[in-house]
């Protein structure tokens, strides 16, 4: 086993990487309120795990979506628990994100030289809201359907480009199968990928610049 480790160590310098990760200086003013960002990340990972589990049973069609969610809740082993955890962690993620934003703002963590860290955080906040909008529609019940109809209809008030934007969001002039397919693709592939990319950027900048000092 040691020979295998030595082989990787010689090429990747694993010990140096481990030492750098475990020996990072943490300022003495850091307290429990600085944990909100980490809790948000934890909620996202829970979302990924539980969401991935549900993709095995969910069917993104207007005729089968609601029935597949019902099947998850009533027939799949621990399906009710997995979906409930997905919903609870979604709410927790939004709440922790809001608290994290307030903490960063109140402690001046957005100021020079951390402007780009703040920008990536704002982008992540927008993506998080988009998760909520797209995920809300997936059961395709009455609440989800009308929520999608209202949200996708908002851009219609924009002069000139409003109508094309609505059609782009819905996939057609009205809410239907194309809309559900787009929202499902956004919720399960596009948004998670964007979140992973911007989270990586966010953490690398925090790692490089360190935690902001007290006011």
From Swiss-Prot:
Keywords: Chloroplast, Electron transport, Heme, Iron, Membrane, Metal-binding, Photosynthesis, Plastid, Thylakoid, Transmembrane, Transmembrane helix, Transport. Heme b 1 binds at residues 100, 202. It is a multi-pass membrane protein. Its main location: plastid. Gene3D superfamilies: Cytochrome Bc1 Complex, Chain C. InterPro entries: Cyt_b/b6_N, Cyt_B6_PetB, Cytb/b6-like_sf, Cytochrome_b_N_euk/bac, Di-haem_cyt_TM. The keyword Cell membrane does not apply. The chain crosses the membrane at residues 32-52, 90-110, 116-136, 186-206. One of its GO terms (molecular function) is oxidoreductase activity. It is found in: Plastid, Chloroplast thylakoid membrane. Heme c binds at residue 35. This is Cytochrome b6. Binds 2 heme b groups non-covalently with two histidine residues as axial ligands. The 4 large subunits of the cytochrome b6-f complex are cytochrome b6, subunit IV (17 kDa polypeptide, PetD), cytochrome f and the Rieske protein, while the 4 small subunits are PetG, PetL, PetM and PetN. The complex functions as a dimer. Component of the cytochrome b6-f complex, which mediates electron transfer between photosystem II (PSII) and photosystem I (PSI), cyclic electron flow around PSI, and state transitions. It holds the Pfam family Cytochrome_B. Its cofactor is heme b; heme c. Heme 1 (or BH or b566) is high-potential and absorbs at about 566 nm, and heme 2 (or BL or b562) is low-potential and absorbs at about 562 nm.
């Amino acid at each position: 086993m040691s020979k295998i480790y030595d082989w990787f160590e010689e090429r990747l310098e694993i010990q140096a990487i481990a030492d750098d990760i475990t020996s990072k200086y943490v300022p003495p003013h850091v307290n429990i309120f600085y944990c909100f960002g980490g809790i948000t990340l934890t909620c996202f990972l829970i979302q990924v795990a539980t969401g991935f589990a549900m993709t095995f049973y969910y069917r993104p069609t207007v005729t089968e979506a609601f029935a597949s969610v019902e099947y998850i809740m009533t027939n799949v082993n621990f399906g009710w628990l997995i979906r409930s955890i997905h919903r609870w962690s979604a709410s927790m993620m939004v709440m922790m994100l809001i608290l994290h934003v307030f903490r960063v703002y109140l402690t001046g963590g957005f100021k020079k030289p951390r402007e780009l860290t703040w920008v990536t955080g704002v982008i992540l906040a927008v993506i998080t809201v988009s998760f909520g909008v797209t995920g809300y529609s997936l059961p395709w019940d009455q609440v989800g359907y009308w929520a999608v109809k209202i949200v996708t209809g908002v851009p219609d008030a924009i002069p000139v480009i409003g109508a094309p934007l609505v059609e782009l969001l819905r996939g057609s002039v009205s809410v239907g199968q194309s809309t559900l397919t787009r929202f499902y693709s956004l919720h399960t592939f596009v948004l998670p990928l964007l979140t992973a990319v911007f989270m990586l950027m966010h953490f690398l900048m925090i790692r490089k610049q360190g935690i902001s000092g007290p006011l």
